[in-house]
Regions:
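FAD-site-proximal beta/loop scaffold in flavoenzymes
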Residues: 1-88
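C-terminal, flexible cofactor-proximal segment of oxidoreductases
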Residues: 84-87, 91-194
Length: 194
């Protein structure tokens, strides 16, 4: 439950029924064929409360990123976009910079980070041994399919791929140590990507 200054219930103005925050997305009910990249948020600002933002897992996606399906036993499969890791970091930096600019005098968010315009990379490692481990490595661009720019698949296939193998496991180990280095703000930490 969210309360306003006077103690009034503002939950429905701030959140959708799924308890994720309503932001600058288009939440109108649409058929999957009518979904467009412009449905997705760009600033992550609450339309009701301009001083509130929701980055990463906190914002409510306007819809799944692909057509929902049902498994043979009736389980709904409705893929949602990745809102942790790399996308969260980019969105968080964008929101933080907009807030800093607004503190400095801007009257609205100055930065944008639409998931329909950004890519993501993920490495899921299995096993701990340096020579026998394996990993699934994948990239996707854009995160939210854009059938206007990429009519056949909704994504740029030159920048969207996946691979399973030992090299991905080594990348995961390297990234693990780089992110710990970055988290400790060691020299050159800002050069390490999200």
């Amino acid at each position: 439950r969210a309360c306003g200054r006077e103690g009034d219930d503002i939950t429905s103005r701030l959140f959708l029924p799924n308890d994720f925050m309503r932001v600058d997305a288009d939440y109108a009910a649409k058929q999957s064929g009518d979904w467009v990249p412009g449905d997705w948020p760009r600033t992550y600002q609450s339309p009701a409360y301009p001083n509130i933002f929701a980055a990463g897992i906190a914002f409510a996606p306007p819809h799944p990123i692909s057509v929902p399906h049902t498994s043979p036993n009736g389980t709904l499969i409705a893929p949602a976009p990745p809102r942790t890791g790399m996308p969260s970091a980019e969105i968080g930096k964008t929101v933080a910079r907009s807030i800093a600019d607004m503190i400095g005098g801007a009257d609205r968010p100055t930065r944008t980070a639409s998931m329909a315009e950004m890519g993501a990379a993920c490495v899921a490692s299995a096993g701990a041994h340096l020579l026998t481990g394996t990993a699934a490595s994948m990239t996707v661009y854009p995160i939210v399919p854009d059938f206007e720019r990429y009519p056949r698949y909704g994504r740029d296939l030159n920048q969207t791929f996946g691979e399973i193998g030992l090299a991905g496991h080594w990348i995961k180990i390297l990234l693990h140590h780089m992110f710990l280095y970055k988290a400790q703000l060691r020299p050159g930490w800002a050069l390490i990507p999200e």
